[in-house]
A protein has these predicted regions:
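Surface-exposed extracellular loop regions of Gram-negative outer-membrane beta-barrel proteins
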Residues: 18-61, 141-147, 284-288
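Short, solvent-exposed micro-motifs at the edges of structured domains
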Residues: 3, 81-82, 87-449
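Aromatic (Trp/Tyr) and acidic
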Residues: 59-72, 76, 324
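Secondary-structure transition/capping motifs at alpha-helix termini
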Residues: 13-18, 196-199
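Signature of Gram-negative outer-membrane beta-barrel scaffolds
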Residues: 1-16, 222-225
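Short, surface-exposed helix-loop/turn micro-motifs enriched in polar/charged residues
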Residues: 17-20, 387-389
Length: 449
């Protein structure tokens, strides 16, 4: 693999005692493992026992390939640096795979890297208050991307053509595996306000506006790629769009407040009984407000006979938001969208055979998250001869206001009358699940001694 150069640099400057300016840049790597490289595609990676046509099978428990694709009977021109052990059952040229779908694992795969940079300005006010503004960005390269090397080139297929004749390697069907040319980009503006704990109160709030784009996410196991939606396997740029993780707006905050009653506080501080009853109580809460994540609208009609997804065409002049909202919004409305019909399927048209739809990956956004959590508690001192015994009681309410945060709708379209016709409303556009559970209240008590 060789050495990996991962430089990192940072700087900080304080032009005044109450102002700090910081910045930094670094390159980080996702180290490869056997799971990422070989186990990524279990049917043909390292350790796989692959069988070819006829009486040819692996005799090495997946240590060496059954056949080399740069051998006789193929137009492949790749080289194989691994030692090659011929199976004992037959001399198997690559032609043993003719007419079949074949998997691949790349050699000399570069390590995925992530460049990150940031610039921030921090200002303190009256010792106990702090405001910070920051820009944070990143760029990922050499990311894993599941693809088909033998996809039919766009615009080559015409009426009455034989599809397999236009494949780059027509001796085979799909050539599926993972490439390493995926990229990602992230840019964000972040603002935060913090009050240190004084006079029984502290709080912090931060807001992030961000945009993340990529052509493949990494939500799979380890560093593997996650769920994929592409319709042009040999055109990675066509898949570059909003990331599955893109959350444009995010607000989070917390607060802690000690009630001003009892000993040492402003009120009811001279009565021992009142101090035990109302003194020392502490309340806290957190707020989470997130805008929705994107999803992809697909059609069940495979208009190009590929092994990816088929996207519809956009219907010009027709709103993506449901048109008959009054009849379908009985269970909730969010910014013009309805739980019973989150998007308008008539805004999309069935593409013609042999064409790709013009709707991009992750072009629509689902519901966001709204959650408030509240807690309260107090520590009681109990009489003890030696070490003090303390009783802590608390109550926690998760999603205290029982606000529903709905899941994503099903983006699969069906029911179009024909090519160029809009899709009909079906049950799949409804949202039937949630991402956050309902209100849960928990009481607890703990004795320490």
């Amino acid at each position: 693999m060789g050495n990996i150069w991962l430089p990192r640099v940072g700087a900080s400057w304080a032009p005044r005692p109450d102002i700090t300016v910081r910045g930094g840049f670094g390159i980080y790597a996702y180290a490869w493992s056997l799971d990422n490289y070989g186990g990524n595609n279990t049917s043909y990676g390292m350790g796989a026992a692959k069988s070819a046509s006829g009486n040819v099978s692996d005799q090495t428990n997946g240590i060496t390939p059954i056949t080399k694709l740069d051998g006789p009977g193929t137009i492949f021109g790749t080289s194989n640096p691994l030692p090659y052990v011929q199976p004992s059952t037959s001399a198997a040229p690559a032609a043993a795979y003719n007419g079949q779908a074949v998997g691949f694992v790349l050699y000399h795969v570069p390590v995925p890297k992530m460049m990150q940079w940031n610039f921030a300005v921090q200002k303190a006010f009256h010792t106990n208050y702090m405001v910070e503004m920051a820009y944070i960005g990143s760029h990922g390269s050499n990311l894993i991307f599941a693809t088909d090397l033998n996809a039919i080139p766009a615009n080559d297929l015409g009426p009455n053509d034989v599809a397999d004749g236009y494949r780059p390697y027509p001796l085979f069907q799909n050539l599926t595996g993972s490439s390493n040319n995926g990229i990602s980009n992230y840019n964000s503006l972040q603002a935060s306000f913090t009050k240190r704990f004084t006079r029984g109160f502290s709080m912090s709030a931060n807001y992030v506006w961000s945009h993340m784009l990529d052509d493949q996410d990494s939500s799979g196991w380890g560093n593997r790629e996650g769920p994929q939606s592409w319709q042009i396997a040999n055109d990675l740029a066509a898949n570059y769009s909003n990331s599955n993780f893109d959350v444009r707006n995010a607000f989070k905050g917390y607060a802690v407040y000690t009630l001003p009653f009892g000993r040492g506080q402003a009120f009811l501080n001279h009565n021992a009984l009142l101090d035990e009853l109302v003194g020392g109580w502490q309340l806290s809460g957190t707020v989470i407000e997130l805008s929705g994540q994107p999803y992809t609208v697909t059609t069940g009609q495979n208009t190009y006979q590929q092994d990816g997804s088929s996207f519809p065409n956009r219907n010009p002049g027709v709103s993506v938001k449901p048109t008959n909202r009054s009849a379908r919004c009985a269970q909730g409305s969010f910014s013009g969208h309805c739980v019973n019909e989150w998007y308008n399927p008539a805004a999309f048209l069935e593409p013609a055979n042999g064409t790709f739809g013009n709707v991009r990956r992750n072009s629509l956004y689902g519901p966001g998250i709204n959650q408030v959590n509240l807690s309260g508690g107090k520590v009681f001192a109990m009489p003890g001869e030696n070490d003090p015994v303390k009783l802590q009681i608390r109550i926690d309410a998760t999603n205290a206001f029982n606000h529903a945060s709905f899941g994503q709708p099903n983006g699969s379209l069906s029911g179009a009358a024909g090519v160029g016709q809009p899709y009909a409303p079906i049950q799949q556009q409804q949202i039937t699940g949630t991402t956050v559970g309902g209100r849960a209240v928990q009481f607890g008590a703990k004795i320490t001694f």
